[in-house]
Curated annotation (Swiss-Prot):
<feature type="binding site">
    <location>
        <position position="169"/>
    </location>
    <ligand>
        <name>O2</name>
    </ligand>
</feature>
<dbReference type="GO" id="GO:0046872">
    <property type="term" value="F:metal ion binding"/>
</dbReference>
<dbReference type="Pfam" id="PF03443">
    <property type="entry name" value="AA9"/>
</dbReference>
<keyword id="KW-0560">Oxidoreductase</keyword>
<keyword id="KW-1015">Disulfide bond</keyword>
<keyword id="KW-0186">Copper</keyword>
<feature type="disulfide bond">
    <location>
        <begin position="144"/>
        <end position="226"/>
    </location>
</feature>
<dbReference type="InterPro" id="IPR005103">
    <property type="entry name" value="AA9_LPMO"/>
</dbReference>
<keyword id="KW-0325">Glycoprotein</keyword>
<dbReference type="GO" id="GO:0004497">
    <property type="term" value="F:monooxygenase activity"/>
</dbReference>
<protein>
    <recommendedName>
        <fullName>AA9 family lytic polysaccharide monooxygenase E</fullName>
        <ecNumber>1.14.99.56</ecNumber>
    </recommendedName>
</protein>
<feature type="binding site">
    <location>
        <position position="171"/>
    </location>
    <ligand>
        <name>Cu(2+)</name>
    </ligand>
</feature>
<dbReference type="GO" id="GO:0005576">
    <property type="term" value="C:extracellular region"/>
</dbReference>
<feature type="glycosylation site" description="N-linked (GlcNAc...) asparagine">
    <location>
        <position position="69"/>
    </location>
</feature>
<keyword id="KW-0964">Secreted</keyword>
<keyword id="KW-0136">Cellulose degradation</keyword>
<feature type="signal peptide">
    <location>
        <begin position="1"/>
        <end position="18"/>
    </location>
</feature>
C-alpha cells in the first residue's frame, strides 16, 4: 500500500510523461477530418471544465480540411496518438449540424451533444480501464439518427491526479462527419460543452488510488441507443 504522499508523487511523475492527442479517424491523415486541437504540438490537456476548450479543444473554433463520409449503423475508428496512457474513461459524443448551417463554421455551441460510447473500469486492487494502452477505438454511429453533418467528439479523462478540484485532465478533439442512411430519431437529454460537467462531479473529482473505489460514475448523460 502506498502512502498518500507517495501516491501524489507517483501521479505527478506520470502526469508529465504520458500526454496524447486524438488526431485522426479511420485511415485519414492526422488533422485531415479532425479539427486541429490546441494541443497538436505539446500534447497538453484541458483542466477547466468551464473553458470553451472543453468542447473541441479549440480556443478559436476552426474547421478541419475535409469531412469523413460514413453511414448510420456503422463504426468510425478514432485514433489516439501515441495511445491512451493515463487511467480514466474514454467517451464519445455526437452533435448534428443544424439544417441550413455549414459544418465548417458551426462550432457545436448549446445543448446539442449526445453520448454514443463510454467505457467502464474493472474493480479490484486498483481501478483499470480497458482504454489504457489502446490507440484505436471503434465508435458506433447509431443507426436511427438523422442523416446529415455531425461533429464527433473524442474525450479521455485522465484521473491520475484527480483527487483535487481541477486535477482531472481532459484530452479532446472533434471530427467532422457526413452521415447518410439514417433514420428520424432525435436523441433526448442533450448536453452542452461547457455545461455538461462540474469540477466536483463524482467521476471527475476522485482519488482512484486510496482508498480504492468500489464504484465509478461516468461523467455526463447516459449513452444514447436506438
Amino acid at each position: 500500500m502506498l502512502a498518500n504522499g507517495a501516491i501524489v508523487f507517483l501521479a505527478a511523475a506520470l502526469g508529465v510523461s504520458g500526454h496524447y492527442t486524438w488526431p485522426r479517424v479511420n485511415d485519414g491523415a492526422d488533422w485531415q477530418q479532425v479539427r486541429k486541437a490546441d494541443n497538436w504540438q505539446d500534447n497538453g490537456y484541458v483542466g477547466d471544465v468551464t473553458s470553451p476548450q472543453i468542447r473541441c479543444f479549440q480556443a478559436t473554433p476552426s474547421p478541419a480540411p475535409s469531412v469523413l463520409n460514413t453511414t448510420a449503423g456503422s463504426t468510425v475508428t478514432y485514433w489516439a496518438n501515441p495511445d491512451v496512457y493515463h487511467p480514466g474513461p474514454v467517451q464519445f459524443y455526437m452533435a448534428r449540424v443544424p439544417d441550413g448551417e455549414d459544418i465548417n463554421s458551426w462550432n457545436g455551441d448549446g445543448a446539442v451533444w449526445f453520448k454514443v460510447y463510454e467505457d467502464h473500469p474493472t474493480f479490484g486492487a486498483q481501478l483499470t480501464w480497458p482504454s489504457t494502452g489502446k490507440s484505436s477505438f471503434a465508435v458506433p454511429i447509431p443507426p436511427c439518427i438523422k442523416s446529415g453533418y455531425y461533429l464527433l467528439r473524442a474525450e479521455q479523462i485522465g484521473l491520475h491526479v484527480a483527487q483535487s478540484v481541477g486535477g482531472a485532465q481532459f484530452y479532446i478533439s472533434c471530427a467532422q462527419l457526413s452521415v447518410t442512411g439514417g433514420g428520424s430519431t432525435e436523441p433526448p437529454n442533450k448536453v452542452a460543452f461547457p455545461g455538461a460537467y462540474s469540477a466536483t462531479d463524482p467521476g471527475i473529482l476522485i482519488n482512484i488510488y486510496y482508498p480504492v473505489p468500489t464504484s465509478y460514475q461516468n461523467p455526463g448523460p447516459a449513452v444514447f441507443s436506438c
